[in-house]
C-alpha cells in the first residue's frame, strides 16, 4: 500500500489557489478512478484507488497547510506505512509555473507543510514532488494564496496531468524511475527555453 498526500488548505475560498496544487493533483487522480475524496479520516479527506496491482490511499489533509503533518503521521500510523511508502505533492515558488521536480528526500525548502511533516514524522527521508508556481517580486503570501491566472493555467493545468502520470510511475516503478522520466523532461524544457531567452536578449541589445 502507498499513501499519496496532496498539500493545500481546506475551504472553498482556497480552491484553485496556487498553494492548493497538491489538492488538484489528488482530485485528478481520484477523478480518473471515478471516486471522490469524501471520506474523512485522521483530519483528511481520503479515498482508495488501485494503480496496477497496488492499493493507494489518496489524502488531502484538512488541517491547513502548516499543520499537515498531524494528518500525515496519523494516516501512516493507521495504515502501518513506512516513510518510503509516502509520496507528498506540494507547490514550489522556486520552480517556474508548471515545472515538476521529484526528490527522494531532503529539507522542506521553506515549504511549511513539508516542514511540519518532517518535524512530526521525525525524518526527511521520504519522496516528494514539487509543482512550480513561480516566485513573485514581492508579496509571497498573497502569491501562494492567490488564484491561478489564465496565463499560468496554460502551464499549470498540463503540469497537473503530468504530475498524475508521475505518481503512477512512482507507484509502479519507484522514485528513481519517476525522477529519471519527469525531472529529465523538465531539464530538456529549461534547456530549450534558455537559448530562446538568450536570443531575445541579443535582439534587445541591438
UniProtKB/Swiss-Prot annotation:
Annotated disulfide bonds: none
Protein family per UniProt: Belongs to the PTH family.
InterPro entries: Pept_tRNA_hydro, Pept_tRNA_hydro_CS, Pept_tRNA_hydro_sf
The protein's enzyme class: hydrolase
Catalytic activity, as annotated: an N-acyl-L-alpha-aminoacyl-tRNA + H2O = an N-acyl-L-amino acid + a tRNA + H(+)
GO molecular function: peptidyl-tRNA hydrolase activity; tRNA binding
Name listed for the protein in its UniProt record: Peptidyl-tRNA hydrolase
Pfam family for this entry, one: Pept_tRNA_hydro
EC number: 3.1.1.29
Region (Disordered): 182-206
Amino acid at each position: 500500500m502507498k499513501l499519496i498526500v496532496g498539500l493545500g488548505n481546506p475551504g472553498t475560498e482556497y480552491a484553485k489557489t496556487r498553494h492548493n496544487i497538491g489538492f488538484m493533483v489528488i482530485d485528478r487522480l481520484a477523478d480518473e478512478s471515478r471516486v471522490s475524496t469524501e471520506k474523512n479520516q485522521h483530519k483528511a479527506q481520503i479515498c482508495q484507488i488501485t494503480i496496477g496491482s497496488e492499493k493507494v490511499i489518496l489524502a488531502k489533509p484538512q488541517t491547513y497547510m502548516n499543520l499537515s503533518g498531524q494528518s500525515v503521521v496519523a494516516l501512516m500510523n493507521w495504515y502501518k506505512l513506512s516513510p518510503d511508502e509516502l509520496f507528498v505533492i506540494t507547490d514550489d515558488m522556486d520552480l517556474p509555473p508548471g515545472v515538476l521536480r521529484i526528490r527522494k528526500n531532503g529539507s522542506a525548502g521553506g515549504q511549511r507543510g513539508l516542514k511540519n511533516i518532517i518535524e512530526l514524522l521525525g525524518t526527511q527521508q521520504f519522496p516528494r514532488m514539487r509543482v512550480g508556481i513561480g516566485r513573485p517580486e514581492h508579496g509571497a503570501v498573497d502569491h501562494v494564496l492567490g488564484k491561478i491566472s489564465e496565463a499560468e493555467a496554460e502551464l499549470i493545468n498540463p503540469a497537473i496531468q503530468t504530475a498524475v502520470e508521475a505518481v503512477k510511475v512512482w507507484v509502479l516503478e519507484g522514485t528513481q524511475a519517476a525522477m529519471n522520466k519527469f525531472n529529465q523532461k523538465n531539464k530538456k524544457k529549461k534547456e530549450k527555453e534558455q537559448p530562446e531567452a538568450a536570443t531575445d536578449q541579443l535582439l534587445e541589445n541591438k
